[in-house]
Amino acid sequence: MLWKGFQKPKRLAFDSESLTDKYGHFWAQPFERGFGTTIGNALRRVLLSSIEGAAITAVKIEGVLHEFQSIPGVVEDATDIILNLKQIPFRLNGDAPKAIYLRAEQPGIVTSGMIETDADVEILDKDVYIATISEGGKLDMEMRLKKGRGYVSADKNFDEDLGLGFIPIDSVHSPVRKCNYSVEAARLGQITDYDKLSIELWTNGSVNPADALGLAAKLLKDHMNIFINFEEEIEASHAEDRKPEIRNENLNRSVEELELSVRSYNCLKNANIQTIGELVQKTEAEMLKTKNFGRKSLNEIKEILASMGLSLGMKIDEHGNAVAPPPGSQPAPSYGGYPGSYGTGGTFGGGGNYGGGGGFGGDNNPGF
């Protein structure tokens, strides 16, 4: 095939120490030269424009007929209030638009935490400033919250079913606030002209960075499928021809060194699985019972363990040695098309070498 010999990353690495609901730092390597920029730019554009989110699309303020009108007893006019409303991050469960309300009659500062919602709407930041009410003033508003993608103009937010007095406003639905990517040189063995792609991602909290990145990649993949006019060939694996060697030193290593996806890592963390030794003693059935742990995460973990000569369902004997499960009970899958680890022991991004020169793609050092 035309792409025979192409180097492709095996998994996405991330910085577990800095990962939050609003920020994530991810990287992958090695890419063939030029692919880092191609993929990074495409992902960034999709992340900023096409991830679905909720935003206020229309506002009705008591006593206000248009957005340039002032409100008696309120410091801000309608325009300033609308601008402040656009800064509030929401999470909307379900696809139907929702009506939310704000009623304030006491003098003082009005914030997003004073908005009345139902169970399907979550205000992610309750401290966003909206307005200040003076003595004798009041603020009574009804707002329409709606899902969408990217930027939507006020004209497109006008619906026939909007009640009298509603002012359509332009809205920004994207939960991704900022996205940067960078490409630097990566080394594979003695070859140094591969790409390492790093992506930094900030969201408003309605979607966590890992899920946003996954959605963007899925959207790109779905659009590319129509260009594929042939059946994909499955790479032949030679791993089954080799008898895996169990490395006892791996059993005491932390699962953080496995360079798992964010979802798989969080599942192990929630299951209180700290070391590789604890992990290999779990069966497939036990792992699938873990909350949010699916078949994709299971296959990912099995592949990583297989590259280390380990598998799920193993027993640890009195000498600390891992004993493989009975033949045929849980066959360890091959890893990509590679018979074992890259270099000397360990995994891609783990404690071993990637063609020499230290760990490849750990949390803090590239290991070149």
Curated annotation (Swiss-Prot):
InterPro entries in the cross-refs: DNA-dir_RNA_pol_insert, DNA-dir_RNA_pol_RpoA/D/Rpb3, DNA-dir_RpoA, RBP11-like, RNAP_asu_C, RNApol_insert_sf
NADP among keywords: no
Protein name per Swiss-Prot or TrEMBL: DNA-directed RNA polymerase subunit alpha
NCBIfam families xrefs: PRK05182.1-2, PRK05182.2-5, rpoA
Role of this protein: DNA-dependent RNA polymerase catalyzes the transcription of DNA into RNA using the four ribonucleoside triphosphates as substrates.
EC identifiers of the protein: 2.7.7.6
Recorded family membership: Belongs to the RNA polymerase alpha chain family.
Gene encoding the protein: rpoA
GO cellular component: cytoplasm; DNA-directed RNA polymerase complex
Source organism of the structure: Koribacter versatilis (strain Ellin345)
GO MF annotation: an example: DNA binding
Catalytic activity: RNA(n) + a ribonucleoside 5'-triphosphate = RNA(n+1) + diphosphate
